[in-house]
Protein backbone atom coordinates (compact mmCIF):
# COMPACT_ATOMS: atom_id res chain seq x y z
CA UNK A 1 0.00 0.00 0.00
CA UNK A 2 1.31 3.47 -0.93
CA UNK A 3 1.19 6.45 1.37
CA UNK A 4 -2.23 7.56 2.60
CA UNK A 5 -2.85 10.98 1.06
CA UNK A 6 -4.71 13.44 3.25
CA UNK A 7 -6.05 16.98 3.00
CA UNK A 8 -7.02 19.26 5.88
CA UNK A 9 -9.91 21.72 5.83
CA UNK A 10 -9.47 24.38 8.52
CA UNK A 11 -6.01 25.24 9.83
CA UNK A 12 -6.95 25.88 13.47
CA UNK A 13 -5.64 24.11 16.58
CA UNK A 14 -6.55 20.60 15.44
CA UNK A 15 -5.87 21.21 11.74
CA UNK A 16 -2.32 22.37 12.41
CA UNK A 17 -1.58 19.55 14.83
CA UNK A 18 -2.99 16.90 12.48
CA UNK A 19 -0.60 18.39 9.91
CA UNK A 20 2.29 17.99 12.38
CA UNK A 21 1.33 14.36 13.04
CA UNK A 22 1.02 13.61 9.31
CA UNK A 23 4.35 15.24 8.46
CA UNK A 24 6.09 13.08 11.09
CA UNK A 25 4.51 9.87 9.76
CA UNK A 26 6.10 7.54 7.21
CA UNK A 27 2.81 6.11 5.98
CA UNK A 28 0.74 9.31 5.71
CA UNK A 29 1.31 12.16 3.27
CA UNK A 30 -0.18 15.63 3.69
CA UNK A 31 -0.95 16.87 0.17
CA UNK A 32 -3.30 19.84 0.66
CA UNK A 33 -4.64 22.35 3.18
CA UNK A 34 -7.68 24.58 2.73
CA UNK A 35 -8.37 27.69 4.79
CA UNK A 36 -10.09 30.74 3.27
CA UNK A 37 -9.32 33.02 6.22
CA UNK A 38 -5.51 33.02 6.31
CA UNK A 39 -2.80 33.72 3.74
CA UNK A 40 -0.21 31.11 2.86
CA UNK A 41 2.48 33.27 4.43
CA UNK A 42 0.54 33.49 7.70
CA UNK A 43 -0.06 29.73 7.53
CA UNK A 44 3.70 29.09 7.65
CA UNK A 45 4.02 31.31 10.73
CA UNK A 46 1.07 29.68 12.52
CA UNK A 47 2.42 26.23 11.76
CA UNK A 48 6.00 27.00 12.75
CA UNK A 49 5.36 28.60 16.15
CA UNK A 50 3.07 27.11 18.75
CA UNK A 51 2.68 28.43 22.30
CA UNK A 52 1.85 25.00 23.69
CA UNK A 53 3.66 22.49 21.49
CA UNK A 54 6.73 24.57 20.65
CA UNK A 55 8.59 25.33 17.42
CA UNK A 56 8.32 22.97 14.47
CA UNK A 57 11.80 21.45 14.29
CA UNK A 58 11.40 18.55 11.86
CA UNK A 59 11.97 20.34 8.56
CA UNK A 60 12.30 23.81 7.11
CA UNK A 61 8.98 25.34 6.18
CA UNK A 62 8.85 27.99 3.51
CA UNK A 63 6.66 29.48 0.82
CA UNK A 64 7.22 28.17 -2.68
CA UNK A 65 4.46 30.43 -4.01
CA UNK A 66 1.08 31.67 -2.78
CA UNK A 67 -0.46 28.25 -3.49
CA UNK A 68 2.32 25.97 -2.20
CA UNK A 69 4.08 25.37 1.09
CA UNK A 70 7.38 23.49 1.23
CA UNK A 71 8.13 21.30 4.24
CA UNK A 72 11.75 20.53 3.50
CA UNK A 73 11.39 19.41 -0.12
CA UNK A 74 7.79 18.23 0.35
CA UNK A 75 5.25 20.47 -1.43
CA UNK A 76 1.76 20.91 0.08
CA UNK A 77 -0.93 22.60 -2.00
CA UNK A 78 -2.85 25.43 -0.33
CA UNK A 79 -6.42 26.43 -1.18
CA UNK A 80 -8.48 29.33 0.13
CA UNK A 81 -11.99 28.19 -0.79
CA UNK A 82 -15.02 28.94 1.41
CA UNK A 83 -17.47 26.44 -0.07
CA UNK A 84 -16.33 22.86 0.65
CA UNK A 85 -17.95 21.61 -2.57
CA UNK A 86 -15.50 23.71 -4.56
CA UNK A 87 -12.25 22.58 -2.93
CA UNK A 88 -10.40 20.55 -5.62
CA UNK A 89 -9.20 17.74 -3.34
CA UNK A 90 -9.12 15.32 -6.27
CA UNK A 91 -6.66 17.48 -8.22
CA UNK A 92 -4.35 17.61 -5.19
CA UNK A 93 -4.63 13.83 -4.74
CA UNK A 94 -6.24 13.99 -1.28
CA UNK A 95 -8.21 10.78 -0.70
CA UNK A 96 -8.95 11.47 2.98
CA UNK A 97 -10.07 14.89 4.16
CA UNK A 98 -9.89 15.97 7.79
CA UNK A 99 -12.79 18.36 8.35
CA UNK A 100 -11.47 20.50 11.20
CA UNK A 101 -13.24 23.84 10.77
CA UNK A 102 -15.78 22.97 13.46
CA UNK A 103 -18.47 24.18 11.02
CA UNK A 104 -19.28 21.21 8.78
CA UNK A 105 -19.91 18.61 11.47
CA UNK A 106 -23.01 16.88 10.17
CA UNK A 107 -23.07 14.24 7.47
CA UNK A 108 -24.60 16.35 4.68
CA UNK A 109 -22.30 19.32 5.18
CA UNK A 110 -19.18 17.14 5.44
CA UNK A 111 -20.25 15.18 2.33
CA UNK A 112 -19.63 18.35 0.29
CA UNK A 113 -15.93 17.39 0.28
CA UNK A 114 -16.75 14.28 -1.77
CA UNK A 115 -17.90 16.53 -4.63
CA UNK A 116 -14.39 17.96 -4.86
CA UNK A 117 -12.87 14.51 -5.27
CA UNK A 118 -12.22 13.37 -1.70
CA UNK A 119 -13.05 9.71 -1.09
CA UNK A 120 -13.53 9.80 2.70
CA UNK A 121 -14.08 12.52 5.28
CA UNK A 122 -13.11 12.44 8.97
CA UNK A 123 -14.84 15.09 11.08
CA UNK A 124 -12.60 16.17 13.98
CA UNK A 125 -15.56 16.82 16.27
CA UNK A 126 -18.65 14.98 17.52
CA UNK A 127 -21.40 14.69 14.92
CA UNK A 128 -25.15 14.43 15.39
CA UNK A 129 -25.57 11.98 12.51
CA UNK A 130 -22.20 10.72 11.18
CA UNK A 131 -21.03 7.45 12.76
CA UNK A 132 -18.54 8.10 15.57
CA UNK A 133 -15.42 6.02 16.05
CA UNK A 134 -12.99 5.99 18.96
CA UNK A 135 -9.72 4.22 18.16
CA UNK A 136 -9.15 1.42 20.66
CA UNK A 137 -12.87 1.12 21.37
CA UNK A 138 -15.05 0.62 18.29
CA UNK A 139 -13.01 1.30 15.14
CA UNK A 140 -13.43 -2.39 14.24
CA UNK A 141 -17.10 -1.58 13.49
CA UNK A 142 -16.05 0.63 10.57
CA UNK A 143 -16.94 -0.75 7.13
CA UNK A 144 -15.47 0.45 3.84
CA UNK A 145 -18.82 1.61 2.42
CA UNK A 146 -18.97 4.44 5.01
CA UNK A 147 -17.55 7.68 3.59
CA UNK A 148 -18.21 10.20 6.37
CA UNK A 149 -17.10 9.48 9.93
CA UNK A 150 -16.56 11.42 13.15
CA UNK A 151 -13.56 10.97 15.43
CA UNK A 152 -15.83 12.01 18.35
CA UNK A 153 -14.44 14.53 20.86
CA UNK A 154 -11.14 14.62 22.73
CA UNK A 155 -13.03 13.93 25.98
CA UNK A 156 -14.90 10.94 24.53
CA UNK A 157 -11.52 9.62 23.33
CA UNK A 158 -10.26 9.82 26.92
CA UNK A 159 -13.38 8.48 28.60
CA UNK A 160 -14.39 5.64 26.26
CA UNK A 161 -11.24 3.47 26.59
CA UNK A 162 -11.37 3.83 30.38
CA UNK A 163 -15.10 3.02 30.51
CA UNK A 164 -14.56 0.05 28.19
CA UNK A 165 -11.86 -1.48 30.42
CA UNK A 166 -14.01 -1.05 33.54
CA UNK A 167 -17.16 -2.33 31.87
CA UNK A 168 -15.42 -5.34 30.27
CA UNK A 169 -13.85 -6.38 33.56
CA UNK A 170 -16.31 -5.35 36.26
CA UNK A 171 -19.51 -4.11 34.59
CA UNK A 172 -20.74 -0.53 34.94
CA UNK A 173 -24.19 -0.04 36.49
CA UNK A 174 -24.08 3.73 36.10
CA UNK A 175 -21.59 6.56 36.20
CA UNK A 176 -21.01 10.30 36.20
CA UNK A 177 -18.11 12.04 34.51
CA UNK A 178 -16.57 15.43 35.09
CA UNK A 179 -13.89 16.73 32.77
CA UNK A 180 -11.65 19.48 34.09
CA UNK A 181 -10.93 20.95 30.69
CA UNK A 182 -8.33 23.38 29.36
CA UNK A 183 -9.60 26.48 27.59
CA UNK A 184 -10.33 26.29 23.86
CA UNK A 185 -10.74 28.77 21.01
CA UNK A 186 -14.51 29.09 21.46
CA UNK A 187 -14.03 30.85 24.82
CA UNK A 188 -13.54 34.57 25.47
CA UNK A 189 -10.33 36.30 26.57
CA UNK A 190 -12.40 38.88 28.48
CA UNK A 191 -16.12 38.90 29.35
CA UNK A 192 -18.08 39.04 26.11
CA UNK A 193 -21.41 38.14 24.53
CA UNK A 194 -22.31 34.45 24.41
CA UNK A 195 -26.08 34.30 24.15
CA UNK A 196 -26.40 30.50 24.02
CA UNK A 197 -24.10 29.90 26.99
CA UNK A 198 -23.93 32.87 29.35
CA UNK A 199 -21.22 31.42 31.56
CA UNK A 200 -19.18 30.55 28.47
CA UNK A 201 -18.95 34.26 27.69
CA UNK A 202 -16.94 34.98 30.83
CA UNK A 203 -13.16 35.52 30.78
CA UNK A 204 -11.49 32.16 30.17
CA UNK A 205 -8.18 32.92 31.87
CA UNK A 206 -9.76 34.24 35.05
CA UNK A 207 -12.54 31.78 35.86
CA UNK A 208 -13.51 28.19 36.53
CA UNK A 209 -16.49 27.88 34.21
CA UNK A 210 -19.07 25.07 34.53
CA UNK A 211 -20.14 23.90 31.09
CA UNK A 212 -22.05 21.15 29.36
CA UNK A 213 -20.41 18.32 27.42
CA UNK A 214 -21.90 15.55 25.34
CA UNK A 215 -18.79 13.40 25.82
CA UNK A 216 -20.22 10.97 28.38
CA UNK A 217 -23.47 10.42 26.47
CA UNK A 218 -21.43 9.93 23.28
CA UNK A 219 -19.74 6.93 24.93
CA UNK A 220 -23.14 5.24 24.58
CA UNK A 221 -22.83 5.67 20.81
CA UNK A 222 -19.41 4.03 20.59
CA UNK A 223 -20.16 1.46 23.33
CA UNK A 224 -23.89 0.67 22.96
CA UNK A 225 -23.82 -1.48 26.12
CA UNK A 226 -23.23 1.74 28.10
CA UNK A 227 -26.01 3.71 26.41
CA UNK A 228 -28.01 5.59 29.06
CA UNK A 229 -25.59 4.62 31.84
CA UNK A 230 -23.24 7.62 31.70
CA UNK A 231 -23.65 11.37 31.67
CA UNK A 232 -21.38 14.22 32.61
CA UNK A 233 -20.37 17.86 32.73
CA UNK A 234 -17.31 19.99 32.30
CA UNK A 235 -15.37 22.67 34.15
CA UNK A 236 -13.35 24.94 31.88
CA UNK A 237 -10.23 26.01 33.78
CA UNK A 238 -7.51 28.60 33.02
CA UNK A 239 -4.86 26.30 31.51
CA UNK A 240 -4.09 26.22 27.77
CA UNK A 241 -3.78 22.48 27.18
CA UNK A 242 -4.23 19.09 28.88
CA UNK A 243 -7.49 18.08 30.51
CA UNK A 244 -8.49 15.39 32.98
CA UNK A 245 -11.49 13.09 33.22
CA UNK A 246 -12.95 12.13 36.59
CA UNK A 247 -15.19 9.09 36.14
CA UNK A 248 -17.20 7.95 39.14
CA UNK A 249 -18.95 4.60 38.65
CA UNK A 250 -20.91 1.91 40.40
CA UNK A 251 -19.68 -1.53 39.34
CA UNK A 252 -21.66 -4.76 39.06
CA UNK A 253 -18.82 -6.97 40.27
CA UNK A 254 -17.05 -6.32 43.54
CA UNK A 255 -13.53 -5.03 42.89
CA UNK A 256 -10.91 -3.42 45.10
CA UNK A 257 -9.13 -0.32 43.83
CA UNK A 258 -6.06 -2.54 43.34
CA UNK A 259 -8.08 -4.91 41.13
CA UNK A 260 -9.16 -1.97 39.00
CA UNK A 261 -5.59 -0.64 38.74
CA UNK A 262 -4.36 -4.07 37.62
CA UNK A 263 -7.03 -4.32 34.90
CA UNK A 264 -6.21 -0.86 33.54
CA UNK A 265 -2.45 -1.49 33.67
CA UNK A 266 -2.91 -4.78 31.78
CA UNK A 267 -5.00 -3.05 29.10
CA UNK A 268 -2.43 -0.24 28.77
CA UNK A 269 0.32 -2.79 28.14
CA UNK A 270 -1.81 -5.03 25.92
CA UNK A 271 -4.71 -4.31 23.58
CA UNK A 272 -4.82 -0.59 24.34
CA UNK A 273 -1.06 0.08 24.22
CA UNK A 274 -0.53 3.52 22.72
CA UNK A 275 -4.14 4.50 23.45
CA UNK A 276 -4.40 3.99 27.21
CA UNK A 277 -1.60 4.94 29.56
CA UNK A 278 -0.96 4.12 33.22
CA UNK A 279 1.07 6.27 35.63
CA UNK A 280 1.92 5.91 39.30
CA UNK A 281 4.17 8.99 39.56
CA UNK A 282 3.02 12.26 41.14
CA UNK A 283 2.35 14.11 37.90
CA UNK A 284 0.51 17.34 37.09
CA UNK A 285 -1.18 18.57 33.92
CA UNK A 286 1.87 20.05 32.12
CA UNK A 287 3.61 16.67 32.38
CA UNK A 288 1.17 15.41 29.74
CA UNK A 289 1.71 18.13 27.12
CA UNK A 290 2.71 16.31 23.94
CA UNK A 291 1.49 12.90 25.16
CA UNK A 292 0.05 11.11 22.14
CA UNK A 293 -2.12 8.67 24.12
CA UNK A 294 -5.88 9.20 24.41
CA UNK A 295 -6.23 8.48 28.11
CA UNK A 296 -3.53 8.22 30.79
CA UNK A 297 -4.87 6.67 33.99
CA UNK A 298 -3.54 8.27 37.17
CA UNK A 299 -3.35 5.39 39.64
CA UNK A 300 -2.56 7.62 42.63
CA UNK A 301 -5.32 10.16 42.03
CA UNK A 302 -8.32 7.80 42.06
CA UNK A 303 -10.15 6.61 45.16
CA UNK A 304 -12.67 3.91 46.09
CA UNK A 305 -15.43 4.27 48.65
CA UNK A 306 -16.08 0.53 48.68
CA UNK A 307 -15.80 -2.47 46.33
CA UNK A 308 -18.64 -1.23 44.12
CA UNK A 309 -18.16 2.55 44.04
CA UNK A 310 -15.03 4.17 42.66
CA UNK A 311 -13.66 7.45 41.30
CA UNK A 312 -11.12 7.10 38.46
CA UNK A 313 -8.88 9.85 37.10
CA UNK A 314 -7.42 9.92 33.59
CA UNK A 315 -5.40 12.63 31.83
CA UNK A 316 -5.34 13.61 28.15
CA UNK A 317 -3.60 16.16 25.98
CA UNK A 318 -6.85 17.31 24.41
CA UNK A 319 -4.98 18.70 21.38
CA UNK A 320 -2.06 16.38 20.62
CA UNK A 321 -3.56 13.07 21.73
CA UNK A 322 -6.74 13.75 19.79
CA UNK A 323 -4.88 14.82 16.63
CA UNK A 324 -2.91 11.56 16.73
CA UNK A 325 -6.18 9.61 16.89
CA UNK A 326 -7.55 11.44 13.85
CA UNK A 327 -4.58 10.12 11.86
CA UNK A 328 -4.89 6.65 13.44
CA UNK A 329 -8.55 6.48 12.41
CA UNK A 330 -7.57 7.36 8.83
CA UNK A 331 -4.93 4.61 8.91
CA UNK A 332 -7.56 2.12 10.05
CA UNK A 333 -10.00 3.23 7.33
CA UNK A 334 -7.28 2.87 4.68
CA UNK A 335 -6.53 -0.68 5.85
CA UNK A 336 -10.22 -1.56 5.67
CA UNK A 337 -10.62 -0.46 2.03
Swiss-Prot record:
The keyword Phosphoprotein does not apply. Pathway: Carbohydrate degradation; glycolysis; pyruvate from D-glyceraldehyde 3-phosphate: step 1/5. Pfam families: Gp_dh_C, Gp_dh_N. It comes from the Eukaryota. Its EC number is 1.2.1.12. SUPFAM superfamilies: Glyceraldehyde-3-phosphate dehydrogenase-like, C-terminal domain, NAD(P)-binding Rossmann-fold domains. One of its GO terms (cellular component) is cytosol. The keyword Cytoplasm applies. Belongs to the glyceraldehyde-3-phosphate dehydrogenase family. NCBIfam families: GAPDH-I (TIGR01534). This is Glyceraldehyde-3-phosphate dehydrogenase 1, cytosolic. It comes from Hordeum vulgare. The gene is GAPC.
Amino acid sequence: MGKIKIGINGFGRIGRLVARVALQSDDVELVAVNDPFITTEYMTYMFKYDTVHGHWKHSDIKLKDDKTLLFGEKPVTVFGVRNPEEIPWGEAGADYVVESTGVFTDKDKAAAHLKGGAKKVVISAPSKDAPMFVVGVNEDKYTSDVNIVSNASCTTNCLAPLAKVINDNFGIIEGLMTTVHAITATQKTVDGPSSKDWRGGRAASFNIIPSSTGAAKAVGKVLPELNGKLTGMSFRVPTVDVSVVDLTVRTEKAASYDDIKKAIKAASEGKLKGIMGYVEEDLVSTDFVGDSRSSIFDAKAGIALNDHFVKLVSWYDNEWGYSNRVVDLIRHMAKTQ
